[in-house]
Amino acid sequence: MSSLPTSDGFDHPAPSGQSPEVGSPTSLARSVSASVCAIKPGDPNSIESLAMEATKASAEFQTNSKKTDPPPLQVLPDLASSAEQSLAMPFHKSSKEAVVAGNLEKSVEKGTQGLRVYLHTRQDASLTLTTTGMREPQIFAEEKSWHPENQTPSPVNGLQQHRETGSVQREAGQQSVPQDQGCLCDAEDLELHEEVVSLEALRKGELQRHAHLPSAEKGLPASGLCSCPCSEALMEVDTAEQSLVAMCSSTGRQDAVIKSPSVAHLASDNPTMEVETLQSNPSCEPVEHSILTRELQLPEDNVDMSTMDNKDDNSSSLLSGHGQPSVESAEEFCSSVTVALKELHELLVISCKPASEESPEHVTCQSEIGAESQPSVSDLSGRRVQSVHLTPSDQYSQGSCHQATSESGKTEIVGTAPCAAVEDEASTSFEGLGDGLSPDREDVRRSTESARKSCSVAITSAKLSEQLPCTSGVEIAPELAASEGAHSQPSEHVHNPGPDRPETSSVCPGAGLPRSGLDQPPTQSLSTPSVLPPFIFPAADVDRILGAGFTLQEALGALHRVGGNADLALLVLLAKNIVVPT
């Protein structure tokens, strides 16, 4: 008998009629299991060698089973028929063959299962190494998570287990079939190997798909596998953006300094202004700052408004510093204006004094100095023509001079009047003008009526002597009466001049034109009636204003406007007469 060395170091005799490989099934199972279990996870070549050994062992087992013709285990009628047909084969031989076949089947099944588990673990570990490239602790955690003890069932695992059980059943069926089906065992074994390879490829594809998905069972997020390259890329982008921001902020600061120093100061103090100047620069394109630009639109508007306010404040301060004088400068300006107006007042008084000195000679009695009054009348007519071309302010000054002339020559007119009626009416007219300071309206009305009567009497008396003195009397007396009556008497008295107009027109037909011209101011005063309320002012102030060449009504109006201050009233009246050349 031949003996086979086993793993335990003893030689077991092989039974007669059997090959040495089949004679010791226990040693064969031990050798196969030892060869399968001695796996080192470090060398990938051992996996292929073990797979080749397993396939060789299965092939040898199939050839031995063909030679020995073992009876099937599952089909009992076949076993009984074979026992009846082969009477020479003892019963213990068939039982030993069944035990050997069962041991071989179990050993092969265990070896294939261990090999598949190791292949599965090895492929997962290599897949994690190639896809993630992570550190050794992560690889260790990955291998630990894919260990069969920690692995959770999944549809792919369930499918693989189902196929594994199916393959085990196929192997059991292949080993239990009779000899006539032995040729099909090799084909099925090859198909099983191909299915295992395809299943492993499918498993690799599924792992590659689900490598980026988060998994709660692993304890580590699957998205963290790609965190290292992604974080490196993001850090590179961040550094590029920071360099771009630094360059653009420097250029933006230079532009801001060139444009406006205040905005540059704000940009150096406020970091948001640096980003705004960066984004306002067209050469700097924002990379991923769309949200930042939207958030910084309002601060930019606020900064623009603040700069505008600062500019407005600066401009207003400049205007207030240069355009508007201070209190001291205003006082100096007023004092200088006061001095200038006083000088102007003195000039006006000096210019009016020769006319007042010459007026008594011209306003003498027409009957006594008819021939001598002709030059004066021509002079007055010339002045009248000049007054037509003058401005209203000049006309006011001329009227004031005429009034001063008439007032200064009041006594001489009274003393040299040709008749008593003219003397009485002239005295009453000038007394009425003097009484115009009182607030009684009846006195004012009497003064105007007496002035008109004196005008008519003067016209009638002058008609007897000459025609020209008549026109001169019409020019002087109605002018005084109209200037006083237009401002002092009520509107109904101005509108109704009285029955003296027909006498004037009938006695002196040449006086109609100046009367019509002098009736226009009362009609203008109707639209804007200037009836002043009665005020009592000091006579000295009124005389002072009258001495400056202004009318009584102008003096009263100016005093009423400034509240009784004679200096201010005089300044107001002088300012009205100033004509600025253009």
From Swiss-Prot:
KW Protein biosynthesis (keyword) present: no
Record domain UBA: where: 536-576
GO cellular component terms given for this protein: brush border; Golgi apparatus; membrane; nucleus; plasma membrane
Keywords associated with the record: Cell membrane, Golgi apparatus, Membrane, Nucleus, Transcription, Transcription regulation
Comp. bias (Polar residues): 16-32, 148-179, 390-408
Compartment list: Cell membrane; Nucleus; Golgi apparatus, trans-Golgi network
Bias (Basic and acidic residues): 438-452, 490-503
GO terms of biological process kind: intestinal absorption; negative regulation of nucleoside transport; negative regulation of protein localization to plasma membrane; negative regulation of transport
SMART domains membership: UBA (SM00165)
Disruption phenotype: Mice show a specific phenotype: first, a post-transcriptional up-regulation of SLC5A1 in the small intestine, with an increased d-glucose absorption rate and capacity; second, an increased food intake that results in a visceral type of obesity.
Endpoints of the signal sequence: none
Keyword Transcription regulation: yes
Region span, Disordered: 1-32, 56-76, 143-180, 303-325, 363-384, 390-409, 426-452, 483-529
UniProt-listed InterPro entries: UBA
Tissue and organ distribution: Expressed in epithelial and subepithelial cells of small intestine.
Subunit record text: Interacts with YRDC.
Function: Mediates transcriptional and post-transcriptional regulation of SLC5A1. Inhibits a dynamin and PKC-dependent exocytotic pathway of SLC5A1. Also involved in transcriptional regulation of SLC22A2. Exhibits glucose-dependent, short-term inhibition of SLC5A1 and SLC22A2 by inhibiting the release of vesicles from the trans-Golgi network. Regulates the expression of SLC5A1 in a tissue-specific manner and is specifically involved in its regulation in the small intestine.
Name used for this protein in its record: Regulatory solute carrier protein family 1 member 1
